Regions:
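Alpha-helix C-terminal capping segments
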Residues: 82-88
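Conserved structured core elements
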Residues: 46-50, 72-78, 94, 102-106, ...
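A substrate-engagement module of RecA-like helicase motors
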Residues: 3, 20-39, 90-143
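Walker A/P-loop
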Residues: 61-82
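Conserved pre-motif I regulatory segment
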Residues: 22-68
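Short, positively charged and aromatic/hydrophobic N-terminal segments
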Residues: 4-7, 13, 17-21
Length: 143
């Protein structure tokens, strides 16, 4: 049986929600019976991951800054993706490497979008250094 989390997302996007509601949604999402438990075989809730997701959700809601450090295997990616998607706000995620960017956009983000029934828009943005400059190419071909 697959539960739909779309009503949960509509609640987030259509009106301001209380801290208690936001906390409850995050706890439900990260529970064994929640969106992640249903979407990821063998998913095990981790308290550190839930705590981080709540902190990220609070920072987004309060438009404040947050720095989080956590060890390998803590579940950092899902801990920031879930509140980012649930927020209904524009969020920019900057990665430390192109490999992590590719993993995030092509593996983790589609999984979260599917698990949460997210209906918003996501985009992969790259800097100018990632594209061919036709002017430079033509100059190189002449030389």
């Amino acid at each position: 049986m697959r539960l739909s989390f779309a009503p949960l997302l509509k609640t987030c996007h259509n009106r301001a929600i209380s801290v208690a509601q936001r906390t409850g949604m995050i706890e439900k999402t990260f529970s064994q019976q929640g969106a992640l438990g249903q979407a990821i075989p063998g998913f095990q809730p981790r308290q550190a991951q839930v705590d981080m997701a709540k902190a990220v959700a609070s920072a987004i809601a309060n438009q404040s800054q947050l720095v989080v450090e956590a060890g390998t295997g803590t579940g950092k990616t899902f801990a920031y993706l879930v509140p980012a998607l649930l927020s209904g706000k524009k969020v920019i995620i900057s990665t430390g490497s192109k490999n992590l960017q590719e993993q995030l956009f092509h593996r983790d983000l589609p999984l979260m979008v599917s698990a949460l029934g997210f209906f918003g828009q996501v985009a992969l943005l790259k800097g100018r250094a990632n594209y061919l400059c036709l002017d430079r190419l033509s100059r190189q071909m002449v030389e």
